[in-house]
């Protein structure tokens, strides 16, 4: 019997806290359906669970330093909740708790993160999230996070825009943290499809090549010249979709690669988050969000 898997299933189905799910399963002899009934009888969940609701808003937050850091996405349902003081504080607590237990979380993943105790508290992260979810009436979800630590002569850099909707985390060889953060800022803003040219799938490269249209007089040129022209076309397409080949947003006279090289930096890894990317979000105007919040509080 995989008890952790049963706890996870019960949490996903009920949105109840981890401790409540564990207790419910223990008294129900690890029967999920019986545990759901127990939770309902004890007022730990509402009959209509939030589990299937869409939480595509929220915040991206960072925590850590140049040696090890985390980029976190904590989701809620509306912008109204996302920019409330309590949600912002919760998001930062999540990030700080994860980075404070870096090795454990890196090795064991999200379930280990949710089971962590908060600093100076017996409450675990999953229950803190569930408690605030019950308080605000929205589905709150730790959607994803990425941890990076630095080795010898390496540095971790993070950037999150002030609106909390785009961010990036990077690992570079070299010690110019400010320059690396500038590249993280560029990555967040420009959102290239790929980081390195080597990341581009062969099928995409073939598509680029197929888009080449022969200019006038092309067939009259020597074969080597034709190959050079074709390669130049594909290289230009590659430069448009890769981070290192893009013009630096802060100085378009050079590429990101040239900027890094000038400052004796080498990019090893880079990951960008866009808040709610990949989630289909129901569009609601601000007035409707306020009205919804007011109705929940009455």
Curated annotation (Swiss-Prot):
UniProt keyword Protein biosynthesis present: yes
Gene3D superfamilies attached to this UniProt entry: 1.10.286.20, DNA helicase RuvA subunit, C-terminal domain (1.10.8.10), Elongation factor Ts, dimerisation domain (3.30.479.20)
**Could you tell me the keywords of this UniProt record?**
Cytoplasm, Elongation factor, Protein biosynthesis
Compartment list: Cytoplasm
What sections of the sequence does the record tag as coiled-coil? Answer: none
Main localization (coarse): cytoplasm
Which InterPro entries does the annotation name? EF-Ts_dimer_sf, Transl_elong_EFTs/EF1B, Transl_elong_EFTs/EF1B_dimer, UBA-like_sf
Stretch list, region Involved in Mg(2+) ion dislocation from EF-Tu: 78-81
MF terms from GO for this chain are: translation elongation factor activity
Query: Record's family?
Result: Belongs to the EF-Ts family.
- HAMAP family registered for this protein in UniProt: EF_Ts (MF_00050)
What's this chain's function? Associates with the EF-Tu.GDP complex and induces the exchange of GDP to GTP. It remains bound to the aminoacyl-tRNA.EF-Tu.GTP complex up to the GTP hydrolysis stage on the ribosome.
Q: What is this protein called?
A: Elongation factor Ts
What is the organism of origin for this protein? Mycoplasmopsis agalactiae (strain NCTC 10123 / CIP 59.7 / PG2) (Mycoplasma agalactiae)
| High-level lineage | Bacteria, Bacillati, Mycoplasmatota, Mycoplasmoidales, Metamycoplasmataceae
Task: Point out the gene that encodes the protein.
Answer: tsf
